[in-house]
Amino acid sequence: IVKPRRHVVHVWELNDAEAAELGPLLQQVTRVLAALVEPEQVYVTLWSHMHAVPGHIHFVVQPVTAARMEEYDGLHGLRLQLAMFERRDAMPADEVNAIAARVRAHLAAG
């Protein structure tokens, strides 16, 4: 997940500095994930609702492999994400934390 440090409900509320940082950061994170996971695609999806009320914006950055799409009968994009949500299919927290640590290390190394 990539999100602004400051509480923001809408993208248009980002100040110029935050907006200028966001695009390159998403590019860097997806580039590192592509190198680490070798996915078919890295989805970047903006979410902000919590119980039908806009909350803090955050971008879900999700590497998706061909094998994962095959598990879901070839679904991709939003349909794949919805099917995964319906099944409550998520990586275990320890795996997410391990990948996040590797991404942070790559970003810190430049």
Predicted regions mapped to residue ranges:
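HIT superfamily nucleotide-processing domains
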Residues: I1-G110
